[in-house]
Swiss-Prot record:
The modification Leucine amide is found at residue 16. It comes from Pachyphasma brandbergense. GO terms for molecular function: neuropeptide hormone activity. Myoactive. It comes from the Eukaryota. Disulfide bonds: none annotated. This is CAPA-Pyrokinin. Keywords: Amidation, Neuropeptide, Secreted. InterPro entries: Pyrokinin_CS. Signal peptide: none annotated.
Amino acid sequence: NSGGGEGSGMWFGPRL
């Protein structure tokens, strides 16, 4: 969503 990293699919999604 508003993350942009390589973490979980909650707030640190696929660079979205």
